[in-house]
């Protein structure tokens, strides 16, 4: 036993020493470069080594602005059509929510929370929505829900098909991956600028900025869910003569449902995180209440509106998480 275990131990120790030596080499090289740079800058005038940004030759901001102006001039009809459709969907959802009596809608929320997520989530959802009503923020809450619902519908309508295409083609996957990385890492404030330029002020640009920020998880998790479907099940479907369409809708999408539901959950949470930023471009709802409290330095008003947003997020998170778990149990039964 001892003779067999010694060689692997020696090999591990040798690899560890080699790894430490590499780290020491790179750390020493970095330190030497810093030292040489400091000595060089101390003994030579600045004119000898002009800074990179002394006279920047790349005016990227100008070209981006020119591109935006070109899009506005040449595609104004398309942007107007998108604005009209989005406004109609948003207003339809908001009017439907506000048309119902508060107690009726509260009962419906509790009923469906019980059906989809169980008794505990139903009790919590009912208590949270009742608390929101007692704070006098019911109508603003419904406006926020309408904005979130519209953004999530658009995000899923775009994200799921793109995720399916990315799962079926490595070339498409490699193409959209850097785009999704940029969409997720770009500061959310930046999305407000093109939203205002293309769609003006109000709820519609708020929805569009939210879609840009919240759509990537829908694409990524749909792609991931389909790619994680076992290969033997796909091959079995081909063996029994299933077409690609049948294989997608009867095998791959049902098995990818837990991952897709996780994408919906993440999209909803990211949409909620945008409601306050969307208020900066005149979007309504609870975000505007927080923004107004910030402008008036009204701590109580901001706390109440912020607490309401948190409660809405918790209710939606619990329900959508339960849907994902139900989908996981359904796929395991398959």
Question: PLM features: residue spans?
Answer:
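Glycine-rich helix-loop "coupling/hinge" segments at transmembrane-helix boundaries
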Residues: 197, 226, 271-312, 324-334
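Short amphipathic alpha-helical coupling elements at transmembrane boundaries
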Residues: 80, 84, 88-91, 95, ...
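N-terminal, non-cleaved signal-anchor transmembrane helix
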Residues: 1-146, 327-334
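Transmembrane helix boundary and interhelical loop/hinge segments in multi-pass membrane proteins
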Residues: 121-122, 225-233, 244, 286
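Generic alpha-helical transmembrane segments of integral inner-membrane proteins
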Residues: 31, 107-112, 126-130, 149, ...
């Amino acid at each position: 036993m001892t003779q067999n275990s010694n060689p692997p131990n020696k090999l591990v120790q040798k690899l560890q020493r080699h790894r430490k030596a590499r780290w020491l080499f790179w750390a020493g090289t970095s330190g030497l470069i810093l030292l040489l740079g400091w000595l060089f800058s101390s003994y030579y005038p600045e004119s000898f080594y002009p800074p990179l940004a002394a006279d920047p030759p790349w005016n990227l901001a100008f070209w981006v602005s020119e591109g935006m102006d070109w899009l506005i001039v040449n595609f104004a009809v398309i942007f107007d059509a998108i604005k009209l459709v989005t406004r109609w969907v948003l207003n339809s959802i908001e009017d439907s929510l506000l048309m119902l009596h508060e107690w009726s809608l509260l009962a419906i929320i509790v009923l469906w929370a019980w059906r989809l997520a169980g008794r505990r989530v139903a009790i919590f959802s009912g208590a949270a929505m009742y608390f929101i009503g007692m704070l006098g923020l019911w109508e603003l809450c419904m406006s926020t829900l309408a904005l979130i619902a519209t953004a999530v519908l658009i995000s899923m309508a775009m994200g799921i098909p793109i995720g399916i295409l990315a799962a079926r083609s490595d070339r498409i996957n490699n193409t959209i991956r850097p785009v999704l990385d940029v969409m997720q890492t770009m500061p959310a404030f930046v999305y407000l600028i093109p939203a205002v330029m293309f769609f003006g002020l109000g709820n519609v640009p708020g929805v569009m900025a939210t879609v840009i920020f919240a759509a990537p998880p829908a694409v990524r998790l749909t792609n991931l869910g389909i790619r994680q479907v076992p290969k033997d099940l796909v091959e079995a479907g081909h063996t029994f003569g299933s077409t690609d369409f049948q294989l997608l809708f009867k095998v791959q999408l049902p098995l990818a449902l837990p991952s897709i539901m996780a994408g919906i959950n993440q999209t909803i949470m990211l949409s909620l995180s945008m409601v306050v930023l969307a208020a900066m471009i005149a979007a309504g709802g609870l975000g505007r209440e927080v923004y107004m409290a910030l402008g008036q330095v009204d701590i109580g008003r901001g706390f109440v509106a912020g607490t309401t947003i948190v409660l809405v997020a918790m209710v939606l998170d619990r329900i959508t998480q339960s849907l994902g778990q139900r989908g996981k149990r359904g796929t395991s039964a398959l």
